[in-house]
């Protein structure tokens, strides 16, 4: 049971009440204070101080300070007046208990309100943080959009420059063709005039000779001049006709022509593209430039669009396989190389170089995947097309040594060379 502390002092003014309660050696952290309109309690075990105030106070403006072993209360009266005493006298126990319970209930309600207010402040702070984050994201998004717009403008300017260059090139070609045609017509006219003049002069001279030597001997007339037209057989491939395979070459040319005419942007939903962007050859050139600049992913995107427009051109798959090889997409390299080899049929001298590249790239990808037997098969297929290529011979020999050797150090050394092919 606590000990009631009665050794307190108090004084008042018309508006305030000042109370001093000694803690009697108790630590300040061990004391508990409860203050309401009509009740004041200080619990500092084993002592207890409580006061049932003479009149109501404003607990929101009242204060308590702990220091030097004393608790000092500054209580602000609700109505200015001089109290007859600090506490009410002759109170019943039931009334005192009721005042205590009301004070505790109000303190709990006040604590709940403070908790709610704290939670509300926390929500406001989180809302403010979210708004600030959204503003930062909006600024970053705007910056990214500006960068994209700048890149789009640059690409548009490059495209316009390319169009102008193509227009000037076509104009120059037309002018050159016109000049060549005029020059040919002029030479033809001069040649025809020269033939007529020679024929007339010969006729006059012959007449004179006949008149002079008619008595001696009559000679036959001079043979008239003429032109023999020679037309050579048109040949797309540089090989001699006796060494070529005409049927296979014609089939290859026919397939190439059909592939160039196979573009259809309407069915693919690409009607919004410009005329240049609908041209697979233009996209192929764009991919080559991006590849040369080291932007392999952008080159793949350009070639993807070109293949969507026309999936019958082997050069698109061949170039994309090179990009995938640079990006270490080895399985895609194998797929594109295989597709290019399917389209590079029938095998003719005109597509020999492309077939060599397809075999070498697929073989390199197989070796990177440690499928050395399959890689060696592709290198040997490339050597059948060009048996004089010393680099491919050296690479094939290295792969054979990797297959035949079981030493890990040797294998690592050879793989390093294969990666540098």
UniProtKB/Swiss-Prot annotation:
Key word Cytoplasm present in the record? yes
- GO terms for MF: nuclear estrogen receptor binding
Q: Which InterPro entries match?
A: CS_dom, CS_DYX1C1, Dynein_assembly_factor_4, HSP20-like_chaperone, TPR-like_helical_dom_sf, TPR_rpt
Region ranges (Disordered): 103-122
Instruction: Specify where it is mainly localized.
Output: nucleus
Name any one Pfam family assigned in the record: CS
The record's Gene Ontology cellular component field reads: dynein axonemal particle; extracellular region; neuron projection; nucleus
Task: List GO BP terms, alphabetically.
Answer: determination of left/right symmetry; epithelial cilium movement involved in extracellular fluid movement; heart development; inner dynein arm assembly; nervous system development; outer dynein arm assembly
Spans of the TPR repeats are 280-313, 315-347, 356-389
Entry superkingdom = Eukaryota
Sorted keywords for this record are: Cell projection, Coiled coil, Cytoplasm, Neurogenesis, Nucleus, Repeat, TPR repeat
Q: Which locations, inside or outside the cell, does it occupy? A: Nucleus; Cytoplasm; Cell projection, Neuron projection; Dynein axonemal particle
Identify the SUPFAM superfamilies for this entry.
HSP20-like chaperones, TPR-like
Which residue range or ranges hold the CS domain? Answer: 3-87
User: What's this protein's function?
Assistant: Axonemal dynein assembly factor required for ciliary motility.
Name this polypeptide is given: Dynein axonemal assembly factor 4
Q: From which organism does this entry originate?
A: Xenopus laevis
